Regions:
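Helix-start (N-cap) detector for alpha-helical repeat units in TPR-like alpha-solenoids
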Residues: 398-399, 432-433, 466-467, 500-501
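Primarily the internal scaffold of c-type cytochrome electron-transfer domains
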Residues: 27-93, 99-104, 112, 124-129, ...
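Register position in tetratricopeptide repeats
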Residues: 410, 444-445, 478-479, 508-511
Length: 511
């Protein structure tokens, strides 16, 4: 089961472009254009190709990033496997790193190559070193893309297919923090636009938390979608965020809000201290020393550091993140002294992040998401007990039904899983996991027509499901439809060069 990314943003249908805002707010607009948030996506133009060739030692695959007539591209090679892909868009400001996207008939996937700014080198993208071949089909979901691009253009009913272009405005637009701008542009009244600094603390902080608070797991509220949250809302009305009880885990790419909440400064200052206390959202970072001396003037005078030193050098050190190589981020926990990250025990409890729901339904879904991770299958019994109760309390909750069905199927109880999958799909036909899982049971029971119907539907939602495509080819093979079997195997080989299963089956079919 693929991890579900649960972030929520303004839908493109309500968008006014940032250029329209510039007509009245030129000075702010010009400053903002030079911030990292303004350049978190776009078309690659000035990439550093000085160290653009590398070999992945564990697999022996050699990668090279280069420019051709169409733009940026990369190739991979380990005889006899080789291939290349265009890289039409980048993701990430480049302040620490930059990832790239590949496209196949409008379906977007994260490329296995990335650029790391501090090291000034190209290497595999985060988590790609676990694969024995170039992995080209990690889906780029709207919930992920929306933290880097604006005015998205997703195709309804799919998970990762987009129109052309996939987003109308690169980077984080004005509306991402200020909400819909059409009424404000028409009236020029302050009441018709969101100013985060003037919101109540929980709504103000939600504007930043939508992208900078992941916790250990996020659980979507019933009926919520990636576009549910609007600036001015409480993020907690759309999702629940859970963290590990009593733990101070290492820094991750999106742990800024969580780490700040762990700091003595935040715990003492409360709502007075927030992201905007130190960060100018329209420009570069404010003077840290001035901010710190506002509370620490007396103690700072007795500090061993020199009078004009930057407080953050010691108290907000740059540290390696735990979920990406070659990347360092600022430690927002503001430690008095540098400390080693705590090791989170396998059985540590999940607790709601302050201000977010800890309802039994949300907790059940959170444990189910954790237990679906390959390294956390030992949490299945706990997740199962919570899901069973949640299923009784919420019999029409498609998310609960799907995760419950997944545990039953993965523990050898398909008869219990089938009605749950079917009910979930009746409630929400877009449920990809249910479509794939129910098709798997049909295949195991040699109900090939049912498996074919479900898996064709799954591939319409996400064309990059190579295992599903390979098994679909086998289902067609079983009913004697060799043309469709070959068609899907050819596509599987093209989408996953180096993956032995479809290549072997295709060779066998063509003998």
């Amino acid at each position: 089961m693929r991890p579900i990314l649960l972030l929520f943003f303004l839908s493109a249908a309500q968008a006014a472009t940032s250029d329209e805002c510039a007509a009245c707010h030129r000075e702010i607009y010009d400053r903002y254009r030079h911030t990292p948030m303004a350049v978190t996506s776009g078309v690659p133009a000035r990439e550093d190709l000085a160290r653009a060739t590398f070999t992945h030692a564990a697999t022996g695959f050699r990668y090279r990033v280069y420019r051709d007539r169409a733009g940026l591209a990369f190739e991979f090679r380990k005889d006899p496997v080789h291939g290349s892909r265009e890289l039409p868009w980048f993701i990430g400001s480049g302040a620490t790193a930059r990832s790239y996207l590949v496209a196949d008939d409008g379906y977007l996937f994260e490329a296995p190559v990335a650029y790391y700014s501090a090291a000034r080198k190209w290497d595999l993208a985060p988590a790609y070193d676990r694969y024995a071949y170039p992995f080209l089909t990690r889906p780029v979901l709207p919930a992920c893309l929306a933290c880097h691009a604006s005015a998205l253009n997703p195709v309804a009913g799919t998970h990762n297919q987009y129109g052309a272009p996939p987003f109308a405005e690169p980077g984080i637009s004005c509306e991402r923090c200020h909400g819909p701008g059409d009424r404000h542009i028409a009236s020029a009244k302050a009441a018709d636009i969101v100013n985060p600094a003037r919101l109540p603390a929980d709504r103000r902080d939600s504007v930043c938390a939508q992208c900078h608070l992941s916790g250990e797991v996020r659980a979507m509220h019933p009926g919520a979608r990636w576009s549910t949250y609007h600036p001015g809302d409480r993020l907690s009305d759309s999702i629940a965020v859970f963290v590990r009880a009593g733990a101070t885990p290492g820094i991750t790419v999106t742990s800024h809000v969580e780490k700040l909440a762990q700091s003595a400064c935040k715990q003492s200052a409360g709502d007075k201290l927030w992201c905007g206390s130190c960060h100018d959202p329209h420009g570069q970072r404010k003077s840290d020393r001035e901010m710190c001396l506002g509370c620490h003037g007396v103690t700072a005078a007795a500090c061993a550091a020199k009078q004009h030193d930057d407080c953050t050098r010691c108290h907000m050190p740059k540290s390696s993140v735990t979920d990406a190589q070659h990347v360092v981020y600022t430690d927002h926990s503001i430690p008095r002294r540098p400390r080693k990250p705590a090791v989170v025990a396998q059985g540590s409890d999940l607790v709601a992040f302050p201000g977010f729901s800890d309802s039994p339904r949300d907790l059940a879904l959170a444990w189910a998401i954790v237990a679906a991770r390959p390294e956390r299958t030992t949490d299945r019994p706990r997740a199962l007990a919570l899901l069973q109760q949640a299923g009784r309390d919420h019999p029409d909750d498609a998310e609960i039904l799907v995760y419950l069905a997944e545990i039953y199927r993965n523990t050898g109880k398909p008869d219990e899983a089938i009605p749950l999958y079917e009910r979930a799909l009746h409630l929400d036909p877009t449920q990809l996991t249910a479509t794939v899982g129910l098709g798997g049971i049909m295949m195991e029971r040699r109900q090939f027509a049912g498996a074919i119907r479900l898996w064709e539907d799954a591939l319409a939602k996400d064309a990059g499901l190579v295992l599903v495509r390979t098994n679909l080819a086998m289902a067609y093979w079983q009913i004697g439809d060799m043309a469709n079997a070959e068609r899907h195997l050819v596509k599987a080989v093209a989408m996953a060069p180096g993956f032995a299963a479809p290549a072997g089956l295709l060779a066998k079919l063509r003998r």
